[in-house]
A protein has these predicted regions:
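Zinc-dependent deaminase catalytic domain
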Residues: 1-145
Length: 145
């Protein structure tokens, strides 16, 4: 990729990761709000944020402030929306505000996503390592950058 294309791609990446951050504000979760966008050919084809499944009360934490086990991650919400649409995530880019966990990494691989841009590092790196092992381009990008 030449310098001009790289610069344009970086500018797009910055915009989309900021948009994912704004989308995270839709989450009802108190402990952590995470947003994800799936982009293909410069079009947002899906979005998601962490939260409870459809039809459940929008309360993510239990009385001990622990995340309930059935809360969906932003990445899973975005990928399942694709599955219910006419879109394909094959060769798309996912922008997500937190580094994917191992379970979401498996979904990303199976969805055919080829790039992941994330803005917040998580204490566990196993999801990132799995994505790289699968040949997915992984980019850390601070929202402030």
């Amino acid at each position: 990729m030449d310098e001009t294309k790289r610069s344009k791609q970086e500018a797009l990446d910055k915009r989309y990761i900021r948009m994912a951050s704004i989308w995270a504000e839709n989450s009802y979760c108190q402990r952590r709000q995470v947003g994800a966008l799936i982009v293909k050919d410069k079009m947002i084809i899906s979005d998601g944020y962490n939260g409870t499944p459809s039809g459940f009360e929008n309360v993510c934490e239990d009385e001990n402030n622990l995340t309930k086990p059935y809360v969906l991650h932003a990445e899973a919400n975005a990928i399942t929306k694709i599955a219910r649409s006419n879109n394909s995530s094959n060769s798309a880019t996912m922008y997500v505000t937190a580094s994917p966990c191992i379970e979401c990494a498996k979904l990303i691989i199976q969805a055919g996503i080829k790039r992941v841009v994330y803005s917040e590092k998580y204490r566990l790196e196993d999801g990132i390592e799995l994505l790289k092992r699968a040949g997915i381009e992984v980019i850390y990008m601070s929202i402030e950058s």
